[in-house]
């Protein structure tokens, strides 16, 4: 494809050409070798992805510093200002495509689609600090994309540090111990949180002997902690035979409605007074025998 054949695409992408530096691996020709990147305004309901450009076919080993340098050159050429915040979802080697934690346990996998972001390989989101920055950069890209036909010599040359053999060897070295500790701690915390939530969901559906289900509010401790706290006070309580609770009918029933109920109640009161009188008599006899009885004290 020649330089004159490049144009803006119908699907909204802008063609962003770069001149590649001379290298022995590139074919020798009078015209400079080009690399084409494609950019489009990103539209998403996710607030974290606002003010972003969707980039396709990034140059090899691109990072945030390379993109900031390019945006600085672009805005300087057209007398405008644009500030880049970060480069999102730039997973060139596909290191984050497989989540081993989700493969080992169902508790680590999430059914919420919004929690996991899927992006094609060799794509990224270039996030700007505000709407003015992305508008300035977008307008400058439109002007820059038209240079390939009339002024091909004004195209920017993509500069990057060629990785050495040592760089690739270090890339496949074992991960740092501190990084592994932090990553394991984070995943274990998430695992324990979801496991506790799953246990609470199971316990909340259990109905006790009285037909009640324990309900816990948002600001209350978990169900298991409440049950353990009750059980620790009296470990034998789980073996006790629970008395049948008084029904509403028994509570409302009058205890002195019939005559025999009144007689029984009076008889019980008299017997209690008589037993107490006899106990006092016996206690007075003992005190008199010990000569400690004083009726005026």
Curated annotation (Swiss-Prot):
The keyword Transmembrane does not apply. Keywords: Nucleus, Ribosome biogenesis, rRNA processing. The keyword Cell membrane does not apply. One of its GO terms (cellular component) is nucleoplasm. Disulfide bonds: none annotated. Gene3D superfamilies: 6.10.250.1770, 6.10.250.2760. One of its GO terms (molecular function) is rRNA binding. InterPro entries: RRM_Rrp7, RRP7, RRP7_C. It is found in: Nucleus, Nucleolus. It comes from the Eukaryota. GO terms for biological process: maturation of SSU-rRNA; nucleolar large rRNA transcription by RNA polymerase I; regulation of ribosomal protein gene transcription by RNA polymerase II; ribosomal small subunit assembly; rRNA processing. Pfam families: RRM_Rrp7, RRP7. Plays an important role in the synthesis of 18S rRNA but is not required for the 5.8S and 25S pathway. Is necessary for the cleavage at site A2. Is required for efficient association of RPS27 with the pre-ribosomal particle. Present with 2610 molecules/cell in log phase SD medium. Component of the 90S pre-ribosomal particle. Belongs to the RRP7 family. This is Ribosomal RNA-processing protein 7.
